[in-house]
Amino acid sequence: MVVRIYNPCTPGTRHRSVNDFSGVANSKYRKNLSFFLHRSKGRNNRGVITNRNLGGGHKRLFRKIEFKRDKFSIFGKVLSIEYDPNRSSRIALVIYSDGIKRYIIQPLNLVIGNKIISDFHTTIDIGNALPVNFIPLGTLVHNVEFKPGNGGKIARAAGAFSKIIAKDKNFVSLSMPSGETRLIENSCWATIGQVGNLDFYNVILGKAGRNRWLGNNPSVRGIAMNPCDHPHGGGEGRSPIGRSKPLTPWGKIALGKRTRKPKRYSNKYILSRK
């Protein structure tokens, strides 16, 4: 994937760059593998805003991604690499030998014509899925399950990967994308390889409107508000926040405060925090 840079013809194109979508299929979405999903736009079930910086954006159809690779011992062939507006990675359309078509997250270096399989004992090739207990140490994996049978949750964004560090009788030590080291059950499934589309993080939006197309609302600084709206607000001119540490709009510590519950049951599975 190559990043294409625009000429500075207008202020909006001065620093703008886009993926050139080379290798991405031009075909229309598959109706049987896509559906409309109501987007919450930062609201909860009562309609109250819980995320102030979400809303708007272009209409999207959600693609049915096979996070749970349950087509065991059946070979699949990659038909095409497609764009998915709902995620940073690309998706690969796979047709299995029984005729079923499904989408999976495209790993790095997975190209059209490659064959993949989900099995307990298979080769360590890009795109193959198997339990982490059968994956060699040091292997890069993605789409890793937190709990057996729940489908992949870990390392699904563009360029993300986890690494198998150590193995025990019932658990496997995993290096998370955040830098955290965590134990997961050895019966959890994972897919071999790193997620593709590494150039996603090199793209510069170039203008505020392009961010609005993605459904992101502007984020207003607290120091630009009034005292009644934010703890950082008020003051004469460009004044400091007037606090010993930055605070959220609701008066809680904004930076460095641990937010994980100290008695959460899964704390015992975290070997080292990020």
Swiss-Prot record:
Report the leader peptide range.
none
Q: Which Pfam families match?
A: Ribosomal_L2, Ribosomal_L2_C
Q: Which GO terms describe its biological process?
A: mitochondrial translation
> What keywords appear on the UniProt entry?
Plastid, Ribonucleoprotein, Ribosomal protein
The highest taxon in the source lineage is Eukaryota
Name a single GO cellular component.
mitochondrial large ribosomal subunit
Which InterPro entries does its entry note?
NA-bd_OB-fold (IPR012340), Rib_uL2_dom2 (IPR014722), Ribosomal_uL2 (IPR002171), Ribosomal_uL2_bac/org-type (IPR005880), Ribosomal_uL2_C (IPR022669), Ribosomal_uL2_CS (IPR022671), Ribosomal_uL2_dom3 (IPR014726), Ribosomal_uL2_RNA-bd_dom (IPR022666)
Identify its protein family: Belongs to the universal ribosomal protein uL2 family.
Q: Which PANTHER family match?
A: LARGE RIBOSOMAL SUBUNIT PROTEIN UL2M (PTHR13691:SF5), RIBOSOMAL PROTEIN L2 (PTHR13691)
Name of the molecule in the record: Large ribosomal subunit protein uL2c
> Which organism's genome codes for this protein?
Euglena longa (Euglenophycean alga)
